[in-house]
Amino acid sequence: TLSGPVSDPAKNDGGFEVIKKHKEHIAAYGEGNERHETADINTFLWGVANR
């Protein structure tokens, strides 16, 4: 499951509001981020990871 301060807003009440602003949040990181992503940067995705 998601954990830590980065994922906390999405898990709390109003979390869907955070998800709806995904593109706005990505834009805050600056230019060139699409080169570093492993999935489409314009689509919000989530899943359980096993690292």
From Swiss-Prot:
It is an enzyme of class 6 (ligase). The keyword Mitochondrion does not apply. Its EC number is 6.3.1.2. Keywords: ATP-binding, Cytoplasm, Ligase, Nitrogen fixation, Nucleotide-binding. One of its GO terms (cellular component) is cytoplasm. Induction: By E.ampelina infection. It is found in: Cytoplasm. One of its GO terms (molecular function) is glutamine synthetase activity. It catalyses: L-glutamate + NH4(+) + ATP = L-glutamine + ADP + phosphate + H(+). Belongs to the glutamine synthetase family. Homooctamer. This is Glutamine synthetase. It comes from Vitis sp. (Grape).
